[in-house]
């Protein structure tokens, strides 16, 4: 686990403890006697067992590494069957070796999807594949032609027309 998570957990537990301590009086007898004299019920300041269990579960989930693959295999068992197929494993290993999957644009797109919490649609999957293919190409001219294809062809056509116009005059 990264050291950053430890710092976050410590800071959150300190903040949680401080929030609990702010609402409680330092000397409980004064408030208790005032409440009894005014006829109000005294509210218990101790958290119940359910709250403690939820807090401990939350802290455990903070310290545990997140694994979304376990959720997928539990919900869709066909994924496990198809992943055990030789051709599927071979294709997946070939795809993971592509340099485009490790590009910064794809990482930014993935972090954007995680932040917004939106569902993956066919268009977003197509966009992620497009980014991976474009970024895995090694040729600069090929990358430019894919990215700026129509503008690139327009500029070259305009230059050719100007060249013919200059020679005709």
Swiss-Prot record:
What stretch of residues is annotated with the motif dEER? Answer: 51-54
> Where does the signal sequence lie?
1-21
Name the keywords, alphabetized: Host membrane, Membrane, Secreted, Signal, Transmembrane, Transmembrane helix
Q: Does the keyword Secreted apply?
A: yes
Entry keyword annotation includes Transferase: no
Q: Where in the cell is it found?
A: Secreted; Host membrane
Positions of transmembrane segments: 149-169
* Topological type in the membrane: Single-pass type I membrane protein
Q: Name one GO cellular component term.
A: extracellular region
Function (record text): Secreted effector that inhibits stress-induced relocalization of the endoplasmic reticulum tail-anchored transcription factors to the nucleus, thus affecting stress responses.
- What note about domains is in the entry? Has the canonical EER motif, but lacks the canonical translocation motif RxLR, which characterizes most oomycete effectors identified so far.
Describe, as the record does, how this protein assembles with itself and its partners: Interacts with host transcription factor NAC069.
The family annotation for this protein states: Belongs to the RxLR effector family.
Protein name (record): Secreted RxLR effector protein BLN03
């Amino acid at each position: 686990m990264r050291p950053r998570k430890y710092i976050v957990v410590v800071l959150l537990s300190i903040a949680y403890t401080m929030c609990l301590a702010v609402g409680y009086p330092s000397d409980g007898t004064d408030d208790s006697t005032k409440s009894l004299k005014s006829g109000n019920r005294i509210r218990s300041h101790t958290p119940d067992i359910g709250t403690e269990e939820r807090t401990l579960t939350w802290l455990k989930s903070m310290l545990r590494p997140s694994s979304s693959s376990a959720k997928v295999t539990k919900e869709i068992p066909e994924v496990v069957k198809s992943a055990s197929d030789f051709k599927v494993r071979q294709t997946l290993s070939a795809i993971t070796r592509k340099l485009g999957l490790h590009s910064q644009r794809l990482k930014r797109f993935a972090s954007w999807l995680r932040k917004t919490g939106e569902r993956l649609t066919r268009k977003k999957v197509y966009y992620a594949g497009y980014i991976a293919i474009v970024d895995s190409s090694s040729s600069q001219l090929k990358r430019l032609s894919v990215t700026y294809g129509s503008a690139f062809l327009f500029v070259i056509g305009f230059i050719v027309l100007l060249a013919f116009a200059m020679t005709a005059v």
